Amino acid sequence: RSRGLGDVYKRQGYELLEKQSYLNLLLSRNVDAVLLIGSHFIENSPEENRYILEAASKIPVFILNGELKGDNIYSILCDDYMALKDMTDLVFARGSESPIYLYRTLNYSGQKKIQGFLDSCAEHGLDISQKNAFSAPGDLHKACSILEQLDADGISFDCVLAADDELATGAVKYALKKHLRVPEDFQVTGYNNSVLAACSTPEITTIDNRVEYMCVTSVSQMMQVFQKEIPPSRTMFSGTIVKKQTTK
């Protein structure tokens, strides 16, 4: 028992065939329910989500911070779209004129975040046909390097909104290397309200995406299903801006 399910939870690959294999492994263990953590389980193609629908025909499936419609599927998520839109509105209100966005992936959650950013930019008069969102799949050092390259390429930006706190930490590192005052000259925001936001100097303004609430709700709804009750198929929490030292 030292292998098997323990290895499933430790693996970091999320390719479709891997996900199907892991879910089938869980089903083979005759589990009572499945909790899928993260929107990386949700694909853009309905056909690629079929394996989840098939699993839900056998046992309840709960999706944490992702959404898929189907019988016996319960989605508990944060409103990532509105959270990022509100954060982008905030930096505009605090004087930013040319913000950019750093993201890791464009999964379900990632698409909601980037759309919130772009919609806010459009509402504030920015030309969103010009690229102002950039992929940054690496660690904080890679994020810093990407920003340095953007600057070298002549792309002007006075604020970085990041899809998570690690990317935001990379943006703070970039600002320090460029001798930019944060937040007077350069604003930075993160996402997830993780320990990285608190460990950074200055501490990073971030978004609390209510992970604790989502976890408690998912377990509560799972118990309701076991007791033959019918919880809502979709539960959405609002993200909260945690104002710290990297925004004006």
Model-inferred region functions:
Residues S2-Y9:
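Short, small-residue-biased leader/transition segments that mark boundaries at the very start
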Residues K10-S28, L84-K85, S135-G154:
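Structural motif
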Residues V31-H40, I100-Y103, A133, G154-D164, ...:
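Periplasmic-binding protein-like
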Residues Y51-A55, Q115-H124, C144, Q149, ...:
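Alpha-helical structural signal in soluble globular domains
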Residues N72-Y101, Q111, D119, D139-E148, ...:
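Hydrophobic alpha-helical segments within soluble ligand-binding/sensing domains
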Residues K85-L126, K131, S233-T247:
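An alpha-beta-alpha
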